[in-house]
């Protein structure tokens, strides 16, 4: 009896370590399985997140890249959609003849040439909305059917905020002068009109484009001076000069200057007021209201030039506007090494300070906005 008990106890002692080892192995397997499962789930979520990000934020940019060969494939499968004005008038459409040959047609000819752009060069709206114009709403079955039958799908139409009557008025007002006119809706930032001259007839692009490319930059018809031309901002820049002064001097209401019709600073330049106007005693508000060059050509000497520069860069001077269409970078050059004359000239928006008409208007829109706005979305 005692021997049986001992034998039974011995068996229990002998089997227990094996059970423990098996359980440890099983636990280790479960842990490895969980780790592998976690890795696969994490990878799947990362891929899914990237696909969502790509389709929502990057698809248009990638597809519109001129090096993306997919564009060529889309143009072979999709008839480019129309570009419409705010009232529905057609600004660009695709004409198809009996033989199936496609021609991009611009009904308003020169009037909208720069803002609508060229489909062949991917400029203006033609470039910004290239992805949408070549995208279709058809389902996969319809697309496969079109591919098999050799028929093309039709791309989306793109509706702009452009107003033909305003565009034509701006075009007529600019006449034969070189320059640009831009009009925007303050509450939304929508572009209502954009004219640049010299201009061109986009319907002649197939035959004339190579010749246009050869024009001197000063006479270039392809240059959109509304976004790519750089000009002195003039008195419109005094807003930024005044703003920086107010930021640096809480007692700005005590500012005082006696205008004699011009201002001179030792080592600098004599800066006259417009038409030699003598404004007399000026505080900051009066100086701003009178656009007194005497006030603003001297006020820069009281400013911290690094802070002045930072303010201007906050308004996208020395930065890309990132507005979709082709644009030049506006310049503000003052720094600690700037000379007296340059500081004088910059204070009144002259000298080396340069801005595009579009950029200047976007800044002006911020003054009229009742709430803060990202200038890139003005």
Named regions from a protein language model:
Residues 1-210, 221, 230, 255, ...:
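Periplasmic/cell-envelope proteins involved in peptidoglycan metabolism and beta-lactam response
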Residues 175, 246, 373-374:
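Solvent-exposed alpha-helix faces
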Residues 2-9, 20, 87, 187-235, ...:
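Beta-lactam-recognizing serine transpeptidase/beta-lactamase-like catalytic domain environment
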Residues 367-378:
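Single conserved hydrophobic/aromatic residue that forms the stacking wall/gate
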Residues 49, 237, 358, 375-376:
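Residue-level micro-sites within transmembrane alpha helices that shape
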């Amino acid at each position: 009896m005692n021997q049986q008990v001992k034998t039974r106890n011995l068996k229990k002692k002998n089997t227990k370590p094996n059970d423990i080892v098996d359980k440890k192995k099983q636990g280790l397997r479960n842990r490895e399985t969980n780790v592998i499962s976690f890795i696969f789930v994490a990878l799947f979520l990362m891929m899914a997140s990237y696909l969502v990000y790509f389709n929502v934020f990057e698809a248009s940019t990638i597809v519109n890249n001129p090096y993306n060969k997919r564009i060529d494939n889309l143009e072979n499968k999709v008839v480019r959609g129309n570009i419409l004005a705010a009232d529905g008038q057609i600004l660009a459409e695709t004409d198809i003849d009996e033989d199936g040959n496609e021609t991009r047609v611009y009904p308003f000819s020169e009037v909208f040439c720069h803002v609508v752009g060229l489909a062949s060069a991917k400029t203006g709206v033609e470039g910004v909305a290239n992805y949408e114009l070549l995208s279709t709403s058809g389902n996969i079955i319809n697309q496969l059917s079109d591919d098999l039958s050799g028929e093309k799908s039709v791309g989306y139409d793109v509706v702009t905020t452009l107003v033909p009557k305003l565009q034509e008025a701006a075009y007529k007002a600019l006449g034969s002068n070189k320059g640009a006119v831009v009009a925007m809706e303050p509450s939304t930032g929508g572009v209502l009109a954009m004219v640049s001259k010299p201009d061109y007839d986009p319907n002649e692009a197939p035959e004339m484009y190579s010749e246009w490319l050869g024009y001197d930059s000063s006479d270039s018809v392809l240059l959109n001076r509304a976004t790519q031309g750089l000009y002195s901002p003039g008195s419109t820049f005094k807003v930024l000069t005044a703003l920086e002064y107010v930021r640096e001097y809480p007692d700005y209401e005590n500012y005082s200057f006696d205008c004699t019709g011009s201002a001179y600073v030792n080592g600098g330049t004599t800066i006259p007021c417009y038409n030699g106007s003598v404004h007399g005693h000026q505080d900051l508000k009066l100086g701003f209201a009178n656009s007194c060059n005497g006030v603003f050509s001297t006020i820069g000497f009281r400013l911290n030039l690094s802070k002045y520069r930072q303010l201007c860069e906050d308004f996208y001077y020395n930065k890309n506007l990132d507005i979709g269409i082709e644009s030049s970078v506006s310049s503000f050059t003052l720094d600690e090494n700037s000379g007296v004359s340059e500081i004088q000239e910059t204070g009144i928006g002259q000298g080396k300070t340069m801005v595009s008409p579009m950029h200047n208007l976007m800044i002006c829109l911020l003054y009229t906005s009742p709430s803060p706005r990202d200038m890139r979305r003005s």
